[in-house]
């Protein structure tokens, strides 16, 4: 990491350094990084494959010793595996493997152990087939139950939707036997009773009862005055 950005608390002053008596000479400063380093050559030690050691070594003999050691290590594990293999093989020999001279009249002609093993294998196969069949049956029942539940849910949703449609329409509610009779009244417009309505010509020509109108132009007095003095 560079140290160029560090502030200089002791600036260089020419002629005042060590061994500088002449002010006209330039100041001399040296960094510790400028000093010579690694001034001695490093040599290989006794255990670092020096040239003398390499010349005196017999690589062929070392290789042969390593191969013999590996062979001994491999043969050490072999008796254990051979013992395991021999124990697994040490079963009663089959009938076809026994020579005819060694057969006894009392010996059975069939191998009972083989028959027992075959029977056990067949029984295991039967049990496995039965379990698989039972599993398939359970899966099928669950699928049918799921389909039935989905169908019932769809039917219930459809029924609720139809009820909402029928109950939301007042005209359809009248047809139902249990729906109460509703009286429909036409609402009056918000501008039915306003004063300035139907101001077109000829609308007020019809005979109407005299009534007070809060409008000087449509009042009876104004109409009579206009008919008498203006027309």
From Swiss-Prot:
Q: Where in the cell is it found?
A: Nucleus
Where are the stretches annotated Disordered? 1-132
Q: For this protein, what is any one GO molecular function term?
A: RNA binding
Show the ranges annotated as biased composition (Polar residues).
24-34
Give residue numbers for the modification (N6-acetyllysine): 18
* One GO BP annotation of this record: mRNA splicing, via spliceosome
Q: Subunit composition? A: Identified in the spliceosome C complex. Component of the PRP19-CDC5L splicing complex composed of a core complex comprising a homotetramer of PRPF19, CDC5L, PLRG1 and BCAS2, and at least three less stably associated proteins CTNNBL1, CWC15 and HSPA8. Interacts directly with CTNNBL1 in the complex. Component of the minor spliceosome, which splices U12-type introns.
Name of the protein in question:
Spliceosome-associated protein CWC15 homolog
Organism of origin is: Bos taurus
Name the encoding gene, please.
CWC15
